[in-house]
């Protein structure tokens, strides 16, 4: 049996690993790098470039250089998150005939799995070059909170790349495998906080060790499939564009070449600010007008970056609370916190996570490589090369059937460990009913139509009887591959019908495509509801923080500003009681606009506090780095 390679197909970077004996090894690509940018470029002469070569030519070919495709995979074009990307991406995102988000590359319509397959092909080639033999099988990781459509699209990408995807596993689970495999960890409960380029996950995982065998059991998972480093970059890019417009009167958003240079510079500045207190974004000849060439030279401090992205970091905290609650644990039950994903290198992210869990995250896990290593370990488990490891993952959403009155009745609740099997007895709704329809659903909503439809089948031949008399046993069985088998049996006549719903493979192409479309169509309103809840949470946070700042500002806030802010707060509070997401966002925007003076006062107060703190510690501190950081930040504020 050949090697099963492990691939972390990331939004920003991808990584491939294999099992080399009992150890996982991350492989270097043709350019000598252990990670590969998830960037694909289609050149004018018909060449397809992947990784660093694609990144290098992006400035001169922005419309045909594709990045962050994982944010589009398995998504509908009308999704709000996709529409946001439409407005900021230099390439063209279009709606496919089936309503999915596709891309227009040099006039050709391309599906996200088709494009992601190019990255997977490079990962496959990297492994083949190292092993000196063909590679046909892989374990590919996905965010824990990816839905069926996104998982299936990822699997399709693997198939297009010439890989049989033996298992799709969740990124935090893979990171836990990488963390726990070679350590004498004993029995521990860990939290894996995974903030990557485009997605965020939190998983609570229990590692048990009995007689040398390690069991990795996922207790709960949560997340946000449209929150990541790309969003942080966008905030910084928008700030730089606005500053340049104020200074030069030119809006760079209309210049794709300038925006591509700015994207690279913003990403570089963000990375630098993880270790430095300030950096310069220096882009000579960024654009030109009638008066001649224009240059950008803007200082950005760590404090400024943090102020731009604080709400994004805070957005990751709510899923932590939900995951802990679902696991039935408190923060004191967590032994270790593991950070995964490049964006977790940001000091503010590390600080917020440490504050939430009351302990410092571990530093001995490589955030860029852990997921690929875990995928390789799972590949080793499947081939039998890795022994004494048992991985128990969970189903992220509840599974059930539609019952009388259009109600969703769950048979398997979310965060149930797989494999699992559950049966329940139902009956007929009408006298002498001879058949029942079993409609299989996925989701957390009470109304059946608000959940995702996974398929349906009929059970015929029920003997005539008064309503409520026949006994129909419905059984849900999920195996270790995440494949759902549903059966319905009339206990009186013995008649039975079955359906297999697979999140991986086995159905023919036409059936797979139909199920994906059906599931997406039925999940549309649920996505909108989730977005509304998310916006409400953001609105609540803004309401609370602004009121707190008004209170702290006291008499320093002019009466006119205070009146305007109070009015905007009341308007936002009213909007939060409604169901209109756009109205809530509009009121949040209005509040932000009238709160400028308040922000200035808050920043001044913060600077004064920092100055006092720096003066007090300057005489005593032994750690030069800390003193420098405090001193620099105060200087920037002044």
Curated annotation (Swiss-Prot):
User: From the record, what ranges are coiled-coil?
Assistant: none
Range of residues in the leader sequence:
none
Give the residue ranges for region: Disordered.
603-638
Q: Molecular function (GO) terms listed?
A: ATP binding; ATP-dependent protein folding chaperone; unfolded protein binding
Q: What induces it?
A: By stress conditions e.g. heat shock.
Domain of life of the native organism: Bacteria
Q: Which residues carry this modification: Phosphothreonine?
A: 199
Tell me the SUPFAM superfamilies matching this sequence. Answer: Actin-like ATPase domain, Heat shock protein 70kD (HSP70), C-terminal subdomain, Heat shock protein 70kD (HSP70), peptide-binding domain
Going by the UniProt record, its keywords in alphabetical order are: ATP-binding, Chaperone, Nucleotide-binding, Phosphoprotein, Stress response
Composition skew (Low complexity), residue ranges: 603-620
Q: Which InterPro entries match?
A: ATPase_NBD (IPR043129), Chaperone_DnaK (IPR012725), Heat_shock_70_CS (IPR018181), HSP70_C_sf (IPR029048), HSP70_peptide-bd_sf (IPR029047), Hsp_70_fam (IPR013126)
Give a single Pfam family match: HSP70
Q: Which NCBIfam families match?
A: PRK00290.1, PRK05183.1, prok_dnaK
As for family, the record states: Belongs to the heat shock protein 70 family.
Role according to the record: Acts as a chaperone.
The protein's name is: Chaperone protein DnaK
What does UniProt list as this organism's lineage?
A: Bacteria, Pseudomonadati, Pseudomonadota, Gammaproteobacteria, Enterobacterales
- The encoding gene is dnaK
């Amino acid at each position: 049996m050949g090697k099963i390679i492990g691939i972390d197909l990331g939004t920003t970077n991808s990584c491939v690993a294999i099992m080399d004996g009992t150890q996982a090894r991350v492989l270097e690509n043709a350019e000598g790098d252990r990670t590969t940018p998830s960037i694909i470029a289609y050149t004018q002469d018909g060449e397809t470039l992947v990784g660093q070569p694609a990144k290098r030519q992006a400035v001169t070919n922005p419309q045909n250089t594709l990045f962050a495709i994982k944010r589009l995979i398995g998504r509908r074009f009308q999704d709000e998150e996709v529409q946001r990307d439409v407005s900021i991406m230099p390439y063209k995102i279009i709606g496919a005939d089936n309503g999915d988000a596709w891309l227009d590359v040099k006039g050709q319509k391309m599906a996200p799995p088709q494009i992601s397959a190019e990255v997977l092909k490079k990962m496959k080639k990297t492994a083949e070059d190292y092993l000196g033999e063909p590679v046909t099988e892989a374990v590919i990781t996905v965010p824990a909170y990816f839905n069926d459509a996104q998982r299936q699209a990822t699997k399709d990408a693997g198939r297009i790349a010439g890989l049989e995807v033996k298992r799709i596993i969740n990124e935090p689970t893979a990171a836990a495998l990488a963390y726990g495999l070679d350590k004498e960890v004993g029995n521990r409960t860990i939290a894996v906080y995974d903030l990557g380029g485009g997605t965020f996950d939190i998983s609570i995982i229990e590692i048990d060790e009995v007689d040398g065998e390690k069991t990795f059991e996922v207790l709960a998972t949560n997340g946000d499939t449209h929150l990541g480093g790309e969003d942080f970059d966008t905030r910084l890019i928008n700030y730089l564009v606005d500053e340049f417009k104020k200074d030069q009167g030119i809006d760079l958003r209309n210049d794709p070449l300038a925006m591509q240079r700015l994207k690279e510079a913003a990403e570089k500045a963000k990375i630098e600010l993880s270790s430095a207190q300030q950096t310069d974004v220096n882009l000579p000849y960024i654009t030109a007008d009638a008066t001649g060439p224009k240059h950008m030279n803007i200082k950005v401090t760590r404090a400024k970056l943090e102020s731009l992205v604080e709400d994004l970091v805070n957005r990751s905290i709510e899923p932590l609370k939900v995951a802990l609650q679902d696991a039935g644990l408190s923060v004191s039950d967590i032994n270790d916190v593991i950070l995964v994903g490049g964006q977790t290198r940001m000091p503010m992210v590390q600080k917020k996570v440490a504050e939430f869990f009351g302990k410092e995250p571990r530093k001995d896990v490589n955030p860029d490589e852990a997921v690929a290593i875990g995928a390789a370990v799972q590949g080793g488990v499947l081939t039998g090369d890795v022994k004494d490891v048992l991985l128990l993952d969970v189903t992220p959403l509840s599974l059930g059937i539609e019952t009388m009155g259009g109600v969703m009745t769950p048979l398997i609740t979310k965060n149930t460990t797989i494999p699992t099997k559950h049966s329940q007895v139902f009956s007929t709704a009408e006298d002498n009913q001879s058949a029942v329809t079993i409609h299989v659903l996925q989701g957390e909503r009470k109304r059946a139509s608000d959940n995702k439809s996974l398929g349906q089948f009929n059970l015929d031949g029920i003997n005539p009887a008064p309503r409520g008399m026949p006994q129909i046993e419905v059984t849900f069985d999920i195996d270790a591959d995440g494949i759902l088998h549903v059966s319905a049996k009339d206990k009186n006549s013995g008649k039975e019908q079955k359906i297999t719903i697979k999140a991986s493979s086995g159905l023919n192409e036409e059936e797979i495509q139909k199920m994906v479309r059906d599931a997406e169509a039925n999940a549309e309103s649920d996505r909108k509801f989730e977005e509304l809840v998310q916006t409400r949470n953001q609105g609540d946070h803004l309401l609370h923080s602004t009121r707190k700042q008004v209170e702290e500002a006291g008499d320093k806030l002019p009466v006119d500003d205070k009146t305007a802010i109070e009015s905007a707060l009341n308007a936002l509070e009213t909007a939060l009681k409604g169901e209109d997401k756009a109205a809530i966002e509009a009121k949040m925007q209005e509040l932000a606009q009238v709160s400028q003076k308040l922000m200035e006062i808050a920043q001044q107060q913060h600077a004064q506090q920092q100055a006092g703190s720096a003066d007090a510690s300057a005489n005593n501190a032994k750690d030069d780095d800390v003193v420098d950081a405090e001193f620099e930040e105060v200087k920037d504020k002044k």
